Amino acid sequence: MSCKLKVKGQYIKDLSFENPNSPQIFLMISKTPPEINISINVSSVSLPVKAQDQSSEQPSDNKVEPLYEVTLQVNAEARVGTTVAFICEIKYCGVFSIESDDVSIEELSQQDIRDVLLISAPTILFPFVRELISRVTSTGGFPPLMLDIVDFRAMYESQMKQGVGQNDNSQDPEK
């Protein structure tokens, strides 16, 4: 089954940078490089959209194109020993619609939708998050933090095997 995402918009939902131990931390990191811990989470929700809410480019057959918000959350914390150097947290979102050349959107399986929302969508959003974190850490007085590329498919599959799953509410806007 071939699903394609259409990006309808993307934005920063939440961005925080803390530099709680400045200026002393700059002397500390000149002697000892900080240890950096990064966590990444992906979630999606179905957006409640009414037919009249959509733009005029919508076909006139009164079908509603489902929209989904995907959130890529990255938390980075740098420490020198037990001293916090910085904490950077971002929630970066994209609003997407899903298309398929093979079948109508109603005929797509839950798994196909989940895969495209939790693998393909964060892959699209990641370069923007990576650049924002690099800029914010640099503006905070630290060397730019360049995140390694993330294999969202491997991350998703690993979490599914562990039974953890990602926070996916893509089919139930009430969650």
Curated annotation (Swiss-Prot):
MF-aspect GO terms: unfolded protein binding
Keywords annotated in UniProt: Chaperone, Cytoplasm, Protein transport, Translocation, Transport
Descriptive protein name: Protein-export protein SecB
InterPro entries in the cross-refs: SecB, SecB-like_sf
PANTHER family: PROTEIN-EXPORT PROTEIN SECB, PTHR36918
Annotated compartments: Cytoplasm
UniProt key word Cytoplasm: yes
A single GO BP: protein folding
Gene (UniProt): secB
A Pfam cross-reference name: SecB
Homology family: Belongs to the SecB family.
Keyword Protein transport in record: yes
Residue ranges that the Swiss-Prot or TrEMBL entry lists as coiled coil: none
Function: One of the proteins required for the normal export of preproteins out of the cell cytoplasm. It is a molecular chaperone that binds to a subset of precursor proteins, maintaining them in a translocation-competent state. It also specifically binds to its receptor SecA.
Any one GO cellular component localisation term in the record: cytoplasm
Subunit structure: Homotetramer, a dimer of dimers. One homotetramer interacts with 1 SecA dimer.
Organism for this UniProt entry: Ehrlichia chaffeensis (strain ATCC CRL-10679 / Arkansas)
SUPFAM superfamilies listed in its UniProt record: SecB-like
